[in-house]
Design a protein with these regions (language model features):
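Ubiquitin-like/PB1-type beta-grasp interaction modules and other compact soluble beta-rich domains
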Residues: 1-90
Length: 91
């Protein structure tokens, strides 16, 4: 199933500057695997060493934060838009 993944500026070095890329998968985990196959290294910036979402990275499937759904097992229906949003901190 094809989905659209919106890539934040800080991760666009992995996508050749593309702000939106296509990926396939029926769950978020599968989409991230497919995304990493096409854009090596990007998954390591989204997931931590234990394979969970990094603490300061939010991922939305449609308008819903996956942390309040099924996390990496969240379904990703065909045509869904996924947004990767890193937290911004400053002082």
């Amino acid at each position: 199933m094809a989905v659209s993944v919106r890539i934040p500026t800080i991760l666009r070095t992995y996508t050749g500057g593309e702000s939106e890329v296509s990926a396939s998968g029926t769950t978020l985990a599968e989409v991230l695997d497919d995304l990493d196959a096409s854009h090596p290294g990007i998954k390591g910036r989204i997931l931590d060493d234990n394979g969970g979402l990094r603490r300061f990275v939010n991922v939305y499937v449609g308008n819903d934060d996956v942390r309040f759904l099924d996390d990496l097992a969240t379904p990703t229906p065909d045509g869904t838009q996924i947004s990767v949003i890193p937290a911004v901190a400053g002082g």
